[in-house]
Structures are given as structure tokens and as C-alpha cells.
Amino acid sequence: MDETHENEASDSFDPVFENSYHDDVTFNTEDDDEPPLEPRFKYERLKGEETLPFMKTATFTSIDLHDKFIAIGTATGLIYILDHHGYGNFDSVPPLKPHRCAVSKVKFDETGSYVLSCANDSKIVVSGVGNDKLCCTINIQVMPKSIYFSPDFIRQQSGHCFIMGERNLVLYEKRMFQYKASSLYSGSERDGFIHCCSWNENLIAFTNDTGTRVYERGAERIITSVQPSHDVDRVRSSRSPPKHTWMPENNLVIGWADTVTILKIRDDDGVKKGEVHHIFHVSMFICGISYIPESGIDNMELFLVGLQLEGEDFDDCASVISTVTTLTALESSACTILKTSVIRPLGLKEFELQSEDMIESVKLSNHTLPYMIHGLGIPYLATYFILTTKHIIMAVPYGPEDGIRWRLKYKLYDEALDMAKHNADLLSKTDLSPKKVGRMIIEGYLTGKRARAAASRLPLICGECKEEWEWAVNQFEEVKLCTLLAEVLPDGTPTLDPECYQKVLIACLFNNVKQFRKLVQTWSPDLYMTSFIIDRTQWRIQQISKSGNLADVDETERVLMDALAHLYLYERKYESALKILMSCQDFQIFNVIDKHQLFDLVKDQITELMNINSERALRLLLDNADSVEPSFVMEKIGRQPKLQLAYLTKLMSRNEGTEFADKAVQLYAEYDQKKLLPFLRKNANYNVNKARKLCSDKGYIEETIYLLAKSGNHYDAVKMMVREYRNMEKVIDYCKDQNDPDLWIHLLGVVAEFPAHFSQLIIEASNCLDPLLIMDKLPDDSDIPNLSEALDKLLVDYTNHAELQQCCYDSTLNDLNVLTQGLISAADESVSVNIVSRCSLCAQIIINSNQETTKKFSDIKVFKCGHIFHLACSTSEMERRQSIEEGLCIACSDQIELINV
């Protein structure tokens, strides 16, 4: 039986698939909330399929691609040349009829000028596509399993070579009149058939049951061999044939059964050898393999086409291989699904699944085997084709529109919006523009009862577009969730129609009163009609008061009243606003008064303001001191002494209110004693005697002592300090500050009443008191503790003091003697007068050579200090000053006056 027709099955095509964007694909995920992998491709029928009758009746057996054409081999031996959209011009390029049976393999040369085909009729045929110069038919004795053109087939003097694989790999090279066959590899029966071969530059790869080998032309040797990593006996190559694809930089990708192997051909000093970089298993039987060039060699991605087996005993390919002897048994135990995957190799045996599509729209029978499906691609055109026995499917990379639709389907709204914005120019005139996608997202969130998420994304979706914001407000109003817009609605750029803001305010008024108040406080009143909101707020307050159904009626009313006060302020109804704020005891009333200068409206309600916040009320009173007299304020708060005290404290800190100093002393004494003494020290406007009597009556010791001292009654102050403090250090410091000897004597008399303190006084004040006076004041009939030690210290201190005085006297006397001796020595010295000596007053030379010496000396005046004067200069200067004693040097007198200054 013809092998190509063995187990041939007719597959049906779902008509819904024609215009689908992967919406009908079913993904098996454990978590329904987690979206599947994003598809990388969409799958379309060729547009020309409906125009070609043979497409509906033919059974396809092979396919090859060129940049311009598709070659389709059929079971009847015909080869159709179509463009990539499935259209064919059979007048110019009629169908080829090279074989009498099903076409096993078909290949284009690199230029697309010739098609190489083979079949089980033992023929290899080179057919021309608009060219017949190199056309030929070669009859052989075996049934070829694989064929491939040389890369330079059409080039002159290249030999126009191609290869054929059966058990042997044979090279056909054109001679003068016929092709010459040369065996490159001879295989045995154990090696099986060569089901796949490929040619890249001078490297020929071919695969049989024992593995994949790479043959180097020129060196004419096999440079590497890779053994299969699956069980060849269980998965026969005739049912699941291997697939090759060459990537840049001599990387060979081998897809065979459920394994993928990536082989790198390296050139080490002119010697080529192969290295396996990746080898791993996938969950399908591979029917086609290609790559995605944009990913690059270092981060390559592979495009795989295959069959996944599902059934009672077929959860994955591993179970198929382990439970079924051959794939022919699949017809009774499994169903097949056409599948594509994009994978990225990681390590030697690891890969990352980038996308996975189960194309269930293509209905395959249970008899479908991997050799019946073909997958090819033109990587640099990003175009990939899948061939079944009845259909040609084109896999086109997802565009922005497809990606957005997929994201919207799986509710990946943020990603969909990002993609729409990134491709805004491309999508501006489509139904997936950023604007329309944004609306779809909002509607999706609202339909899915995720209104809060929808609201949070409005700034990103609507941006500064007024129309979009107003549309969104209407959408939220329809679902009665306008309260969610309170935090996101723009109040600047753009500015919406007043109705939009009013809808949100009314929604918050009836559902979230705190949010309503916040909006009233933060939104500009220019955004909405304040009169309308005031009317609705008043009606709502009345409704709440009458119903009494709310659990927290008082709190709700208070919040709404606060909001109403702000609305009145916007309407400049200040009296109504202040009345509400005052009744609610709202702290904000002070800000309102300051901002709008409304003190005159509340100056009669000072007590109420004090009850709200005394600190702010006092500040308000002081800031408006010109509008209200302190006496008026004191009268208003007369029944609240603590408020009076706070007011006077603030008032006097500004050096005002001196007439209330005595009142302040009284209030401090009653309510804040800690501040009384600092006030007494700082202020000088109170009556000292009244203050002293008040402090004395209340038993305020420190304040009383201070007032006694301030009134000059130091004796009583000292006496009180000794009796109350019993701390001699403070008393002694006080006496030292006064520097009054009589006060010390008084202190001794007072301390004599307390013998326990007498020793301490002697020790602390020994330098300030006369020892004889201390001895005289010692009590005769009292036992003074530590008296001997105190007297010892007194005598030691007195002795030291006397010695210090004597030393100072001796030192001073010695200094006087030294200075006197120096003065006498200076007076005994002669004064030299020469030709360069000058008068100390007029600075002229004393000795003039034009005058006689006797005359010159009779005209000068010389002092022992060394200063020389003309007699005339000295006489006139002394007469002018009249303050210089006779016989004193004028120059020295000037220096003494300068020092004194």
C-alpha cells in the first residue's frame, strides 16, 4: 500500500475559525482567575481558498515555502504554486504533474525558480516555475524519503546539485548530458530511512533512525552525529518524521517526536565540529519547526507545530510513548489536537514556554498522525504556515489590535490600556483606539462589579479629556456609585460641567456625609451651583432630624451642619455660617473669623469662643485689640477666672493691660502659683504691699520673701528665710548680694536663735564677718554643734586673710621703692643737646648754626625727662593751657592726660 495514503484521514474545518482572533481557544488552567499565556499568533485561512475549487477536494501531502510562493503537493501527484494568500494564476503557472502518486516531499530552490519533488513512484523531478532550463526527471530504483536543493543550485558552474535521502544519502550533480549520482553516506537496514535532510552553506544535515549527522562538503566527511533522545522503536520515524531548520550562525534545530535538539556547528581553526547546546522534551509530537528572528541567537525563540494526544491514557507525550507500542494504536485510544508553541531555551534541558495555542477549531480525526501535518515558516517575514490534509492555515503574529482584544477578553485591563496608548497613532481610527479601549475597560469593571477599580483608573484613562470624564460620570451614575468618583474627579484641568460635580456631591450627601463635607471643603465653589447644594443639604438635615432612623443622628447632623456652614461662606452668608459653627463648637470658626475679618460679628460671644478654644480665642482678642477694650473682655469673662488669667497672660506678654496687674497677681495666686513669682519679678505695676499680704495669707514663702526684699524690708526677709528655709546658703547669698554690714549683724542675731545653723554660718560667711563680732554674738547658754571645727576654720581663714593683706602691702611697698629709685636715677642723668635736637613743641632744630652758641642756650628750656623746648614755645604754651604746674614738662603732661583718657 502506498505509504503516503496509509491511515489518511479527512479533517474538518470549523467555519467560525475564519475570522476568529483566538476567542474560541480553550485554555486548560488550574486557576480560572489566572489568564493563560498570551498568544503570539492568530490563525487564518488563506483568502484565496474560496476561489480555488481544488482546495475543497484535494488531499494535501506536502508543502514548501519561498519568499513569494507556496508549493502544495497533493495525493494525486499534482503540485500547485500559490502566493502567500492562497491565490494562484494557473494561466501563467499551471499546476505541475510530476508524479503519478502522492507527492512525498516538495522543495523550492533559493530563487524560487525551480521545484524539486519526489514520490513513491521512484522519481525525483526538477520542475520549473516560469523557467524550464534545468528541468529534469530522474528515475531511481528506490522510493526517496527526503530531498533538498543545494543553496547555489541555479548558479552557473555550480553543478546544479541536490540531494536525496533513502537508506543512503545521494548527491546528484549535473554533467554534460545527465546527472551523476554520488553516495555521501551509506546506511544499513538497521539505520532506517533518511526521512529528513537539509543543506546550509557547505553543511548537509540528515536524520535516520540512528540519529542526525552533519556532512561537510569540501572536507567530504561527517563532522558530527547526534543520537536520538527518544525511543525510536516505539515512535517510528515513518509516523513521526524528524524536522530540520537552520538558524543563523550555523545553528541546526532538530525537532523529532517529542524532542527538540539545538546543535551548534563551530569552526575551530578551520576544523568544524558540532556541540549540543540544548536538548529537551515537549508535550506534543513535533510536525514542524521554525524560529522567530527578532529574539536573536542569544535569546532565541522557537516556533513549534505539533499534535497533542488526549484521552484516558494520554495526558502527555511521555504516557503515549510508555503505553502504546506504535502510533498506529492511537486511533482506538486517543484524540488529537493541533497545537503550536513558542518556547525559549534556557539551559541544556530547560526551556521557558512563551505561548501555547491549541487550535481546536481545526477538527482532526483520531487517525491523524504527525507525518500528515506540516509546519513551515519564513522567519524574516514573520509568516508561518500549517498544512493539514485538507487545509492551509497561516499563522500571523499578533498585532496591537489582537493583543488588546486578548487582554480585554481575559480582563487584563491595565495591560490592554498600556498597549493601546503605546500604539495610539496606529489605532487612532479603529475601534480599539485608547479612548474606546478605556471606555471598554470602565464598562468591564462596572459589569464585573469592580467599580472601585474602575474609579481608580479613571485618571489614567480619561487624562485631561473633559468628554471622557463626563461620560464616566454618567456611567457611574447609572450604577448608582458616584460616591467612588469623589477622590478622582478632576477639579482643575479639565474642569467639567457643574452637573458632574453636583451628581457626586448629591451621591455623597445621601451615602457618605463625611466625604460630602470633605468635598465641600476642598472643591472650589465655582465648580458647582452652591445654592442648589445648600437647598439639598438643608432638606437632607430636616429629613434626618425627622426620621431618627440613623444610629448616629447627632454625628451625621453635625457633619452636615459643618458642610452647610462652608456652603454659606461660599455664598457670603457669614452670619448664618458663624451661627452654625458656633453651635457646633467647630474649631474652624477661628480660621473663618480671621480669613473674612468677622470679629465684629462675634465680639459679644467671647465666652462661647473661649469655650471652643481658649488659646485661639485669646489670640483673636489680642489681634483685634483695637476693636475691643480689655475692660470689656474682662467683664464678659468675669465669671470665668481661668479664662481671665489666660487673657491677662497674653495681654501682658505684649506689655499691655498694666491696670490689671493686681488682678493678675490675685489670679496667679489662686490658679497658677508656679507662674506667680516669675510674674512678680518681671512686672512692676502691681501694689507690692497688697501682693505681699496676699502671698503671706496664702503661705507662699518664696513669693513673700521676694516681696519683702522688694519693699526694702531686708531684716524681715532674712529672718523669714532663716526660719522657713533653714538653708544658710540662700541666706548668705542674699546678704552678699545686698552688701550691707548691718544686715550681717542682724543675720547673726537671727541665727543665734537657731544654734544648729551657727556653725554653718561661721563656715560659709567667715570671709564676710569680723571674727570678733562673731565671737561676741555666740550664744552663751546654747550647745552649738561643730563649733570647734567652725572656729578653727574661722581662725584659719582670718589668718590667711591677714597674711594676704601683709603680702600685698609688702609687694606694693617694694614696687614703690623700685619706681622711686628709677625716678631718681633718671633725674640725675644729664640731657644731651646737639645739632639734631628739636623742640618738642614746634619740632624745629634747637641749635641754629647762624646764631651764637651763648644766645642759643639762653633761649631753650631743658627738662630731666629729656624733652627740650624753645623758651618762647614753652612760655606761650604754658600761658595758653594755664593748667600745667610750673616746673612740669609739657610733653609728659600730654602723655599723662592721654593715659587718663
Curated annotation (Swiss-Prot):
InterPro entries listed in its UniProt record: ARM-type_fold, Clathrin_H-chain/VPS_repeat, TPR-like_helical_dom_sf, VPS41, Vps41/Vps8, WD40/YVTN_repeat-like_dom_sf, WD40_repeat_dom_sf, Znf_RING
Gene Ontology MF term list: zinc ion binding
Disruption phenotype: In 1-cell to 20-cell stage embryos, there is defective autophagosome degradation with an accumulation of lgg-1- and lgg-2-positive autophagosomes and paternal mitochondria close to the nuclei. Clusters of cell corpses in the distal region of the body and show no dsRNA uptake. Reduced number of gut granules in the adult intestine. Endosome/lysosome fusion defects in coelomocytes. Double knockout with either sorf-1 or sorf-2 RNAi results in larger endosomes and larger lysosomes and thus suppresses the endosome/lysosome fusion defects in coelomocytes in the vps-41 single mutant.
UniProt main location, coarse: membrane
UniProt-annotated stretches for the region Disordered: 1-37
Its membrane topology: Peripheral membrane protein
Spans of repeat CHCR: 618-760
Family: Belongs to the VPS41 family.
Subunit: Probable component of the homotypic fusion and vacuole protein sorting (HOPS) complex consisting of the core class C Vps proteins vps-11, vps-16, vps-18, and which further associates with vps-33.1, vps-39 and vps-41.
Listed name of the protein: Vacuolar protein sorting-associated protein 41 homolog
Organism of provenance: Caenorhabditis elegans
